[in-house]
Amino acid sequence: MIYTGIEYIFVNISFVMFFFVTLLNLINLFYKIDKIDHFSKNSMTIAFFCTTGFLITRYLQTRHLPLGNLYESLMFLSWGFSLLYLILEVRDQIGLSHAVLAPGAMLIHAFATLSLPQQMRSPTLLVPALQSQWLMMHVSAMLISYITLLCGSLLAITLLSLFYGKVGSVTLEHKFEKQSFFFLMNPRKNLWKQTGAENYSYFLISNSRKCQLINCLDKWACQTISLGFSLLTIGILSGAVWANEAWGSYWSWDPKETWALVTWLVYAIYLHTKVDKRKMGEGPAMTASMGFFLVWICFLGVNLLGVGLHNYGWLA
């Protein structure tokens, strides 16, 4: 009973903090206020430790890794989003990750706490198939890969919203700015005379900032997806070994296995298109955006069917 009360406190505080951070970042999109970054970082730190406290409390209750049902997995996802937020807080100087990760953590947390029935949120014993030493390696690798892939895809979606319809393929450091520069300097347009020196300078500065945003988004999306792809590969391989031990077959074309393979192939295509690091365009960003929906299909969608070997304890 005492564990239930502690969990309730941790869950509610973390949800309030996620909501507060999301609100602060939305305000910061329109009104750049220095103190907002400080408050949002501290609030996300509180949310991170509260979610960590929930996971530890659930472990003390069940004596197994808190990844045994949908509720625990979703809470682990929100924990991972908050951790990535704090990591990128240090490394991302532009702050693009804040507006992406904070709403993601809040929505996942809200779905887990407000949408799932009480029965699904209650601690449960592991089904026999999950009572294995492979649980930590396979399930944690898959969930962490989902966290990083979702984060990278959200960054790609943000990039696409800035980039779509502007140019088809640009060289990051030069081409985007050069095109705008020559467009402005085209004597047939007489833009210098029409807009004046002040507007001309403002346009160049604005375009330079947009190019910097696109560069940063592309960099973080590629690096995050690369990490997630590696973890997804480890998760699939460890799952195949575990499946052979539990069910006598490395691969059975279970719905979740099939969609995991489809997701892996889509992100493999994305990384293949990013071999030339100087290039970016709509194609890679759209591929990563497609991966965002595939991850959710793989994580939640196939369980709505109520069939398959991975259906235990979820949405059936």
UniProtKB/Swiss-Prot annotation:
Gene field: ccsA
Source organism: Adiantum capillus-veneris
Organism superkingdom: Eukaryota
Membrane-protein topology: Multi-pass membrane protein
InterPro entries to which the protein is assigned, alphabetical: Cyt_c_assembly, Cyt_c_biogenesis_CcsA, Cyt_c_biogenesis_CcsA/CcmC
Protein's UniProt name: Cytochrome c biogenesis protein CcsA
GO BP: any one term: cytochrome complex assembly
GO (cellular component) term, any one: chloroplast thylakoid membrane
Keywords on record: Chloroplast, Cytochrome c-type biogenesis, Membrane, Plastid, Thylakoid, Transmembrane, Transmembrane helix
